[in-house]
Every structure is written in C-alpha cells, then in structure tokens.
Amino acid sequence: MAYSYTEKKRIRKDFGKLPDVMEVPYLLAIQLDSYRKFTQADTPFDQRKDMGLHAAFKSIFPIVSYSGNAALEYVSYALGKPVFDVKECVLRGATYAVPLRVKVRLIIYDKDSSSKAIKDIKEQEVYMGEIPLMTDNGTFVVNGTERVIVSQLHRSPGVFFEHDKGKTHSSGKLLYSARVIPYRGSWLDFEFDPKDLVFVRIDRRRKLPASILLRALGYTTEQMLDMFYETSKFGLTETGECVLELVPSRLRGDVTTFEIKDKDGNLIVEDGRRITARHIRQLEKAGVTELSVPHEYMVGRALAKDIINAESGEVLFECNTEITDEVLAELVKSGVKEFETLYTNELDCGPFISDTLRSDPARTQLEALVEIYRMMRPGEPPTKESAETLFQNLFFSSERYDLSAVGRMKFNRRLGRDSEVGSGTLSNEDIVDVLKTLIDIRNGKGVVDDIDHLGNRRVRSVGEMAENQFRVGLVRVERAVKERLSMAESEGLMPQDLINAKPVAAAVKEFFGSSQLSQFMDQNNPLSEVTHKRRVSALGPGGLTRERAGFEVRDVHPTHYGRVCPIETPEGPNIGLINSLATYARTNSYGFLESPHRKVVDGKVTDEIEYLSAINEAKFVIAQASAAQNENGELTEELVSVRFQNEFTLKGPSEVQYMDVSPRQVVSVAASLIPFLEHDDANRALMGSNMQRQAVPTLKAQKPLVGTGMERNVAADSGVCVVAKRGGVIERVDAARIVVRVADDEVEAGEAGVDIYNLTKYTRSNQNTCINQRSIVRTGEKVSRGDILADGPSVDLGELALGQNMRIAFMPWNGYNFEDSILVSERVVQEDRFTTIHIQELTCIARDTKLGSEEITADIPNVGEGALSKLDESGIVYVGAEVASGDILVGKVTPKGETQLTPEEKLLRAIFGEKASDVKDTSLRVPSSVKGTVIDVQVFTRDGLEKDQRSRDIEKAQLDQIRKDLNEEYRIVQGATFERLRAALVGNTAMTGKGVVKGQPVTDEMLDELSHDDWFKIRMNDDVLNEQIDAAEVALAERRKELDDRFEDKKGKLETGDDLAPGVLKIVKVYLAIKRRIQPGDKMAGRHGNKGVISVIMPVEDMPYDENGNPIDIVLNPLGVPSRMNVGQVLEMHLGLAAKSLGEKIDEMLKQQKAVAEIRQFLDQIYNQIGESYKAEELDTFSDDEIIELANNLRDGVPMATRAFDGAKEKEIKQLLTLGGMPDSGQMTLFDGRTGDPFQRPTTVGYMYMLKLNHLVDDKMHARSTGSYSLVTQQPLGGKAQFGGQRFGEMEVWALEAYGAAYTLQEMLTVKSDDVAGRTKMYKNIVDGDHRMEPGMPESFNVLVKEIRSLGINIELEQDN
C-alpha cells in the first residue's frame, strides 16, 4: 500500500484482523450531494434532471391567466457568481449566496380566432432572489454565522395499515385502520369502530361511513357489494323450499343447524356438529352440488342484487336487504325462482361493508358529495358544482395532491402490485384496493405495518427541504402572476413586471434563517462539525414533537443496523429522536437509508459491493463482517451467525447471500472513535460519543496513543485542515500561507501551475473556541493530491486529536477523587497541557439617534488618561493590547437630551462655549470576569461616510497582503515559464537576438546574462521554437493582466462602504483572545463516558510516583469502573502504557545513536511481529532518512489503532507490555509523594486520553455584591448574564429556620434582598465602617398585598405609632 505524506511520518499500529474491503466514504457526502442535486449548478440547462429547482419551476409553470389568453412559461434558470467569498461573508455578517435568474417566456394568444393562434411572444430573464450556496464543508453562511441544515427522518409517503393495540375500547378489541399519506395533500384514513363498521376520515376530521366515499366515487350499492363479497346462490321452489348451490369448501368451520345427507339419503354431517375438512372431502366425493336448507338458515343473510318484479319492473327488495321470514314469503309469492345472498362468515369474511352500507344515510352520488362537503366546510351552503370541485381537488388534482415517486412506489408495493411507478394522484382503484386490503387484514389475511421500520421512514436532506420551501414561495408568486396576466396584453407588460420575487426570497430566507432544522453549527472541534452534519432528526416541520413521541419511536430498531447508530443520541428529552448516520450509510434515490454489503456466492465471499435498503434487506441472509473465512474467501464455520428477516439466527455457509463490509458499519463516526468500544456498556459509550463533541481544542494538539484508525478520516473530511488540491512541490511555507508549485502532469493547459493556500489564523468559531491552522510541510517536499498540508484545530499530523495523553493511576487519594472527582498534578498546568484559547467577539455599534448621531472617538467626557491609554486617535483599542474587565475597547459618545439650564450655566456657556456636557459616555468596555489580548479589530463604515484613520490602516494592510499573494503567484508562473523556455532553447541554434551568436547553439550562460524581456526577443532557427517563445510571452502578459484585474476587483470591494442595517453608521468589532488554564471546577472526561470535575490541583511533589521517580499526572477513583461497566478505559490504560514504553525504548535507541538497521528491526518487531493484523507495514520501502524521521515522531509513544469490534486482544497487549519492558499485569508499586512510603498494593498505571470539555468554571461562576434588581419585586436578578445574585430559596429558608438562626434569616430576607431602604442604608453604613443593619419592609410584601387586593379582598397594614 502507498503511504500518504502524513502516514509516512507516523504509522499507527493496527490490530485489525479483518481486511479493509471498502474505504470509509466521504463523511459529508449526504449534505453536499443533496444540495448539488438541488441547484444542479454545474449541469448545462438542457441536461438538467427533473429535481431540485428545475422540478420546482416545472411544477408551477406554465401559469395561464384566468381568461386563458396569456401564459407564462418557464425556459431555464442560471445561477450567478457570489459577490463575497465565504470568509468575507463571515466577517461582514453577510449571507453567502448567488443571484438566481430565471428565463421565462410570456405568450399572448389571439382572442378573436377560434383556434388558439399565438399573437405575441416575449422572453426575458427575471431576477428571483438569492439562493444561499453551500460551502465546500457542507455548511451555509447566513448573516455571517455558519449554519447546518440537519436532515430529517420522517414518515415515508404511501399507505400504512395499523391497529390501536386495543387501547381505544375497554374490551381490548383491536381496531384496524389504514392511512394514505401523500407527500403533499390531504390524508385519507379508513378505520374500524368497535361495532365493526368501516369509517373514513379526511385530514383527521369528523368520520363518515366509508361507503360515502365509495358512493362519491360513483359506485352503487350493488357494485360495492360485488367488489367486496362473493355470493351464495339459492333457488326457490313453488312450495317455498330453498335450495343452496353448494360450494363445499365454504362450509368449513360452520356449525350445522340441520342434517346434511347425500343423494342416496346417507347421513354425512349430523345436526349441531362443526364441519371439518373430512366432512368436506366426503361431500365432494359424494358429488353433492345442491342442498335443501330450512328457512332458519336463510334468515339474517343479505341480498346481493336488487330483486326486480319481472312483470311490473319495480324493485321488490333492494340489495343488502336482510332476509326475514316475511321477505322469503314475499319472494315466493312474487314467483322469484332464484336469488343471491352475500357470503359472509365469522371466521374470515366479515359483513363489515354490508353493515356499513346500512348505516349510510346517502343514497346517491350527489348526496355523498354533499355530505363530504359539509364535513370539510361546515356551515357553508353546498351547491352541486362546489361539492364536485372540492371532492375532485382532494385526491385527484395534481396541483393539490402529490404522492411523489416514493409514495407511489411504497403504495404499489404495499398493495402487492407489480409496477413501481404510476400517477402522483389517487385513482378509484387505489382507494378501493386500500379498503380491500384493510378488510383482508381485519379478516385475518395479512399483517399490519411497523411504522418504526426504516423502510417506512425516509430521510429528507437539505436539497429536498430547500426545494419544498422554494415551491411554497413560487405558489405565492403564482397567485399574483395569474391576476396580473390578464392585464399583460392590454398594458404591454414584460415578464419582469409580472413576477415579484419577494415571496420566493422570503420563503428561502425564512427556511435558512429560522427553520427548526437550520441550526447554528456546533463548531467546538472537527468531530462536532462532522457529527452535526451527519445528524438525522425526527423533529422539525412535518415530523414528530418531543411531547407526542412515544417509547417505540425512540427505541433501537433491528433495521437501524448499519444505517443509524444505536449508540449516539442525546441524553434527555430528545433521546432517540435525534440520531446519527452510521459510518457507511447513505441515502438512495428515494431517500431511504441503505448500507453496503459484500455479495456471497455459494459460500464464497466476493469483492462485489451492493447497497441494500431496509426494504430489501429482510429478504436476504446476511453474515457479520467478522465471519471466519480462509484465504480464498470461503466461509469456514459450519454455522454462521446471520441476520434474516430482521432476526439473528444461525445458517450454513451455502445459504449466506451477503456479508457486512466492516464491523464498524454498525456505529457512527463519534462512536467509532472510542477504542475498545466492545468492552463498554452502551449507556457509557453514548456519553463517551457525546462528550467527544464537547472537547475544547487544546493549545498543542496531541494525537491519541490509543486510537481506532478513524482519526485520519475525520480530520481529512471535516474541512478544518488544508488538503492539497493537486500534487506538486512545496515552493514556500510561512505561518500564514503555503505555496505549491503544481506537478506538470496535473496542470491543465492555460492555467497557473501554482496553488496558494492561505491559512486561517486565530479566528473565532461559533462556540468561541480558536480556529488556527499550522503548516506541517517543509519547503522542497513533494506532496500528492489529497495530502494534508496544514493541521487545523484539534488535529495533529493529519489525525484528529481532541485531548492529551495523560499518565493516570487508579487509586483513592485522601477523598479528593470521591464521586468522580479528579485529582490533577500541577505539572499539567505548568506544561500547558490543557490550556485552551477562547476568542470573544465584542461589537460596538454607532447609530443615528433622534438627538444626533453617536460618534466613535477617543474624546470621552469624565474619563482619565489611564483609561484611554490603550486607544488610538480614532478611539479604537490597539491590536496586542492586554485588557481586563472594565477597560475601554472602543470610545463612543451619545448625544444627551437638552436639559433646562440655570441662568448661571447659560452665562458660563455663552462665555466659554462649553459643549462637553451634552454627550454621555457609552463606550464598549470589556465585560466582567474577562481578561485577554486584543488580536484583531474590524471596522465597517456605512457607504458614503468618510472612513477614519483606523479603517484606512486596516484596508491598506489587507491590500498589501492581496498584492503579495498575487505577486507570489506571478513569480512562480514566471519561473515555471522560463524553466520550460530554457529547456527548449538550450542547445538549439539561434538566429538573432541580444547576446546570442548567429548560427551558434544557445547555452545556459548566455541566457543567465540576459534580462527576461530579452529572452522573448531571441529568434531561433526553428520556427516551432519561435512560436513557443511568442506563446510564452503572450501567456505571461495575459496572466499579469488577469492578476491585476483580480487585484482591482478586491480593492474595489474593500474601498466601497459596507451595507449596514438602517440607522447604523459604523460597526467596530474587537476580537479578544482569552487564555484559560485548567483549574478546579473544570469538567474533564475520557472517551468511555468517564467524566468528572477537577477537585484540586496538587503540587508535583505530593503526587504518587513510581520506582523511577515518574510522578502521576491524574489520579482517578477506581470505584468509577465496576458499576459503570466501561472496562474499555482500563484496557486503554494498559495499551497506552505499552505504547508509551515502546516510545521510550525508541527514544533511548536514538539517543544512543544505534544503527538504522537496528531501529528498523525494532520497528518491524512492533508493527509486524506482534498481533495478527491483516496487513503488514511495508517498512522496507522506507529510506533510512524516513525511518529516522518516523522513529523521531514515535519518541513520545507508538500510536495504536484498536477498531470497534475488531480490536486488540489481551494477549497482544501483554506482548507489547513485555516488549516495552513493563510488567504484563499493567500494575506497579507507587510511592506516596508526601511521605515517600510505598502504597500497600500495586496500582494500575497507564496512559489514558483525557479531554477538557467546554463546561468551564470561568463561564459558570461569578460573584455579586450589588447590581441590577427586578422591576416588580425589587429582588436581585438571577444568572451570570444579568450579573445576578444567588437564589436563597424556600428550602434554604427552612434550613435557617431549623437552626433557629433568626437574625441571619432576617438579614437574608430583607437587606440582602428586597428591602430597598434597608439595603441603601446598609451600603452607607458599611462605607462608614459601621456594620449595623436596620431591616425594613420587604418590597415583595407590598406585591403580595397588591395581589390580594386584586382578588377583591381589602388588606391593610396597621402600624403602631
């Protein structure tokens, strides 16, 4: 295998026994692919598929006017270029979007001619608002903040059959129902009630008998009975005897009420016996086809057809009439020879439709339509037309109703039809088939659906949701356009006069800005970004709500396997409603999640990979990825553990049809980053996956010694690193950019052979953590496409690095690690292991007020020199200034209202022209409890206002940077061009030119003495070479011009003013970098759900140490392991100890300058001789220098990868411990740092990867003396943001009462809270050094009095004089 640039520098030892069949797919594909399908930006408009924007336009257009004389047709659309790039949008608070222009055609028809003759056609491009663009990392920048649109898991359109689980009726009877869910349109429900009648509901309104709907569709009673029932035929003799045409199989299970005999009079079934299969066989053998039945047998049956009097033609009895003795007598009297009844029985053919028809008030189609109209629009008088139109629009109009391709596919599959395509609206057959299937299920044929099955839930991603919103906007436009179209002809309007783009723009903006699924991106670290984009939520518009979601929806379903992670989901009210995609899962064209599988043929595993959705998966027998196989890929076990029909069973190898591709395909990205996941309890693994997302990037990222091999994928796909777009050689590297000269074979004709990567330096993330990129390449090194050139936050040499490897011991230590507390050594603080940088953005806005405009200035009234020392002449703080709470960052003054002046003041004003008192100081100050360094200042000025000195300086610095970049690019292109020219010219004969001799070959020395301009003047003997020289000159000139144009464009953007909100003159943004060291109260965690709060930081000399004098960094409580069942952390510690000790061995060898061969041999022993990994590391392909570099990178430990469900075994860990010279128990004797005595027994010591979580004590704790008070109760406000007090609540009062601490209690409830006079007096007293208090009346008592009075009860306080 080929190693990438970073892999070569540090190889991770992999314990995996199973080969990698398939690379982990690109992790953000679900977002990018979905939005690409929506915009289809790179597809020429004649090749665009019917999806996304294109489909939305096609579904609304053409719009025809009411008169039909004018129509507006859609031709195509084009997306423009974004004005600002992503970084500029974030800085300016703009939305990263492109203008959408739609080409439409207005056609006007001739009114007079009978056939529609076209009178006029106008075509025009119309602006339809802005469409937000997705960045390369799958996010959107909306108003300057990065947002993510989370995919939604919703119920697939189609038809579903279910029952109420016996909850509706007290008897516990199962009531079945069917529901047709369209993609958009009205829901149609059929349901049984406890009396076994069938009802229909439309849009969950009042229920009507189901026969009303069928009648409205145009079916008569007779047709309905014919559709749902078979009939029994009877003959009537003159004497009134009934003869049944016998179908023997129908009798099975009935109890006879009379004897059944054959033709010869032999008894076959006695009276009162149940007819069995044996009886039926006897009847068939005897050839009995007719049976004379008594009248009692007939009573209670229903007629299947209308019975008509042959002579008069009148209807004697309507169909569905129940037969009684009177009816029979009438039939005999009328001379009816034969009639048919409905065949029903108790077992598998109930009389549901027949009974429903009897309860149906409607008799004709019109009555049924009116009944439906009344239910849908109560209170409106129905007319025939309105009732027909309403019903037609409900399910049969493509404008109002759409099942969608998915819905039609699910609908047809569920009803057992062959075709998967069809119309988007319902047909009569569709409705009847749903009802038939429902009745079959009630009759015991067929089963209900499982709505939590992933074959019945589909994923709606960004593109689809954006398309729906866009369509909503277009529908609003359509109404307006229809009305204007009638005027189009008379007033000669153009298409752009007809279309108002505002509704479309508003709908799109609303979706991206404030939809429940458009979320502020979680940007704590690269993993949290990736996880956020791969999240699948069941909440949101058209989804579930937290309160209504029951237990079943939240539970893990067998179909989640390989599609949705069973581990990663939030704790709390959203548990199970928000899920994460499994590592290998993707969505198919219908939006169902599918998972990859290897095909197995005749017990032999092939390399062919097929994706199966949950719908298809159940049919197949699927083996686990870990199933044992030999070299030829044949399954070796006699019985293989397989999944079949969503159950886990055992089958023989020949029956296996598919096999999983990887053991980690079950879990999500975050869970696959937990080493030894298979040894952790699921609840703790859930916490582990969730807490990794909260890890704050540390100052120096450090790769995990014990990882899982997924770290590389996450770092590369997250988009926080700089990845080489094309291979080449590193031309230059500095802190802010990397310049790559692209390899010749990757340069396309006529483009620059240079890639410049500007690094992001110290910028703020959404969570106020620090985003910083550091280059890891050196000048002159070769890189290939896809290599990582610079590490982002929490990335170390191209691997995700969320925390630090700490030396840990499991032991109690004087109660300091009681209940998950963590004891930390001071060394951790000194080495800045968990020091993090947080960046805060503070904004100062100067507005136009009624009294005049605010001004940003250094001239602030009543402020001393000291406070202004950090401001420049514009009143803005210097970059690099260290500021603490209360310091002024931006000086700002606001005009004050004119107050009435005394005559004396007026006189002074008149004499001295004193004007300073009419402004007040509203400067931006550093908030309380914040201390940091100013790292950046941005000034935005409204267009048309003069910029201050500071903005001009910032602008100049930015322009210099751009100019420098462009010059660099030109220099490299120029260098490459002249290199190619030199190669072409040297050794060939010259004709004319400066410094060349005619007829002599050109040499390197000749060229070196010429200036570059003179090179172009050389003429050669060979015309081909002359053309090459000319082409090079033209190409360089063009490049220069292009770069100048680019510079002018950027300059123009910088120099124009900014588009600020109305009334805003200037915005100053100050960025503060705050350094947070670790301290007691901060929350830390491992990757196995083992979290805790730091209780104390102990000096190094007090910490326990081993025989070599190495102190422990962190002491954890051993009682945190057994009850939590996350043993993975213990294994991680053992393997970490082995990794570290091997690193120390390598370090020793390097210090002793051992031969390279010896080091190579030791590395080979580590990588290739311990464990049964499926792949050997090819150390022979490394040069000696590369081996030394690799060894140098392994000095602080050899990184290991132990994958989920395919990790290191105990034996392998012991071998590595032994190789590193450690006891294979992983335990050692420790000594007490304070006394020097050894502890009683050996202690488990090792290295664990610890994370510092974004729950820092600095953000949570504050102290207040005096501050703001609530308006009504006059009690101090609560919360850190309001600088509030500590609540002394009900239970705390009880505690003081229990102690009888009366004075303390009085103080708490009066002067420390809401006794206004008392607290002011107290403040004065303390200032005077007098510590007495005089409690008065608490304000809340007055509030109570007022509330009682508001109830109409007079209450007064009597005071003793």
From Swiss-Prot:
Statement: the UniProt record of this protein carries the keyword Transcription: yes
Record carries keyword Membrane: no
GO cellular component terms, semicolon-separated: DNA-directed RNA polymerase complex
Protein's recorded name: DNA-directed RNA polymerase subunit beta
Similarity comment text for this entry: Belongs to the RNA polymerase beta chain family.
Single Gene Ontology BP annotation: DNA-templated transcription
Domain of life: Bacteria
PANTHER family on file: DNA-DIRECTED RNA POLYMERASE I SUBUNIT 2 (PTHR20856)
Quaternary data: The RNAP catalytic core consists of 2 alpha, 1 beta, 1 beta' and 1 omega subunit. When a sigma factor is associated with the core the holoenzyme is formed, which can initiate transcription.
Biological function: DNA-dependent RNA polymerase catalyzes the transcription of DNA into RNA using the four ribonucleoside triphosphates as substrates.
InterPro entries: DNA-dir_RNA_pol_bsu_ext_1_sf (IPR042107), DNA-dir_RNA_pol_bsu_external_1 (IPR019462), DNA-dir_RNA_pol_su2 (IPR015712), DNA-dir_RNAP_su2_dom (IPR007120), DNA-dir_RNAP_su2_hyb_sf (IPR037033), RNA_pol_bsu_bac (IPR010243), RNA_pol_bsu_CS (IPR007121), RNA_pol_bsu_protrusion (IPR007644)
Pfam families, alphabetized: RNA_pol_Rpb2_1, RNA_pol_Rpb2_2, RNA_pol_Rpb2_3, RNA_pol_Rpb2_45, RNA_pol_Rpb2_6, RNA_pol_Rpb2_7
Keyword vocabulary terms for this entry: DNA-directed RNA polymerase, Nucleotidyltransferase, Transcription, Transferase
Gene: rpoB
Coiled-coil boundaries: none
Molecular function GO terms recorded: DNA binding; DNA-directed RNA polymerase activity; ribonucleoside binding
Catalytic activity: RNA(n) + a ribonucleoside 5'-triphosphate = RNA(n+1) + diphosphate
EC class (word): transferase
EC number: 2.7.7.6
